Swiss-Prot record:
Residues 271-276 are annotated as: Important for the catalytic mechanism of dephosphorylation. It comes from Cupriavidus metallidurans (strain ATCC 43123 / DSM 2839 / NBRC 102507 / CH34) (Ralstonia metallidurans). InterPro entries: HPr(Ser)_kin/Pase (IPR003755), Hpr_kin/Pase_C (IPR011104), Hpr_kin/Pase_Hpr_N (IPR011126), P-loop_NTPase (IPR027417), Ser_kin/Pase_Hpr-like_N_sf (IPR028979). Homohexamer. CDD domains: HprK_C. Catalyzes the ATP- as well as the pyrophosphate-dependent phosphorylation of a specific serine residue in HPr, a phosphocarrier protein of the phosphoenolpyruvate-dependent sugar phosphotransferase system (PTS). HprK/P also catalyzes the pyrophosphate-producing, inorganic phosphate-dependent dephosphorylation (phosphorolysis) of seryl-phosphorylated HPr (P-Ser-HPr). GO terms for biological process: regulation of carbohydrate metabolic process. The active site is at H146, K167, D185 (proton acceptor), R250. Mg(2+) binds at S168, E210. The gene is hprK. This is HPr kinase/phosphorylase. The Walker A ATP-binding motif also binds Pi and PPi. ATP binds at G161, E162, S163, G164, L165, G166, K167, S168. Coiled coil: none annotated. GO terms for molecular function: ATP binding; magnesium ion binding; phosphorelay sensor kinase activity; protein serine/threonine kinase activity; protein serine/threonine/tyrosine kinase activity.
Length: 323
């Protein structure tokens, strides 16, 4: 996993309010990060944070009530040895959860070794779940793509195409028909799971849509709160093409896909020409994609009916010759 620039300070700043973290020791270790080799070999965020475990000392160690009670029951020598092993391998930081007070000798060791020590009243399980989700998000593969990203009938749709084909005008038409804007011009996509790509708008462009001749439009102000979305799952790409595009296929026999962050996304191509109602065509494409995701393929059904009709015709002709 790629965790460049992720330090104990950045993790604390991003999560302190959500899980009520307090920094009680090891302030000098603010720039401490994951071991590079350990982070590279990690296959998921579950490898990076968990309950106290000396077998995996390089990860974020969370100590809940059971761990603290176990630590307190140990004799001096075993306790010193175990904590010495843990501190020696420099974990990014330790978290004492469940509202427990960190043992004084643990706090002293963290101070001397510049190992960040956090406390929180939140349960250890909730802390681990929250940090795993956070680390998954910041380390996930991401890309910025050009286009207009919309919520159409509950489906995340990215409209792409050459400059000047009317992507923003089409987006404005769809918004006026009750659909929602996620982002215009630049869309940030992040792959959060094996089949899950989420798209968001960069903060600088939030709620804005640029239309030639009109300039920048604040969609939230013009159309209201329900006309914008904070994020959507990417499910469909609509590619606008010029009418003279030689690669355009009128009846594609196979589904078309666009590779986004290693995940194949359904794609449809729509020719741009005078008199065509592109908004209606996009809505129809979305409805058809919804049917395909449910296992209903209109073109395949038609081909099956046509094949059955041709076979029946051949059989009837053969019987006619026999008569």
């Amino acid at each position: 996993m790629e965790l460049t620039g992720v330090t104990s300070q950045s993790i604390f700043d991003d999560n302190a309010a959500d899980i009520k973290l307090s920094w009680v020791a090891g302030l000098e270790g603010a720039d401490r990060a994951f071991d590079v080799e350990f982070a590279r070999e990690a296959t998921s965020a579950a490898d990076l944070v968990g309950h106290l475990n000396l077998i995996h000392p390089n990860r974020i160690q969370v100590l809940g009530k059971p761990e603290i009670l176990y630590y307190q029951r140990l004799d001096d020598e075993p306790r010193k040895r175990q904590m010495g092993e843990l501190i020696l391998l420099e974990p990014p930081f330790l978290v004492v959860a469940d509202g427990m007070e960190p043992p004084p000798d643990l706090e002293l060791r963290c101070t001397r070794s510049s190992t960040p020590l956090f406390t929180t009243p939140v349960s250890s399980a909730a802390v681990i779940d929250h940090l795993r989700l956070y680390l998954s998000r910041i380390s996930a593969p991401r890309v910025t793509m050009h286009g207009v990203f919309l919520d159409i009938l509950g489906m995340g749709v990215l409209i792409m195409g050459e400059s000047g084909l009317g992507k923003s005008e089409l987006g404005l038409e769809l918004i006026s028909r009750g659909h929602g804007l996620v982002a215009d011009d630049a869309v940030d996509f992040v792959r959060l799971g094996p089949d899950f790509i989420e798209g968001r708008c960069p903060p600088l462009l939030q709620n804005l849509l640029e239309v030639r001749g009109l300039g920048l439009l604040d969609i939230k102000t013009i159309f209201g709160e329900t006309a914008v979305r904070r994020k959507m799952k990417l499910k469909l790409v609509v590619q606008l093409v010029r009418r003279n595009d030689g690669e355009f296929e009128r009846l594609p026999l196979d589904s078309q896909y666009l590779d986004v962050l290693g995940l194949p996304i359904h794609m449809v191509k729509i020719q741009v020409a005078a008199g065509r109602n592109l908004a209606v065509l996009v809505e129809a494409a979305v409805r058809n994609t919804i049917l395909r995701l449910r296992g209903i393929d209109t073109l395949r059904d038609f081909m099956d009916r046509q094949r059955a009709a041709m076979q029946a015709d051949v059989v009837s002709r053969g019987q006619g010759r026999l008569l």
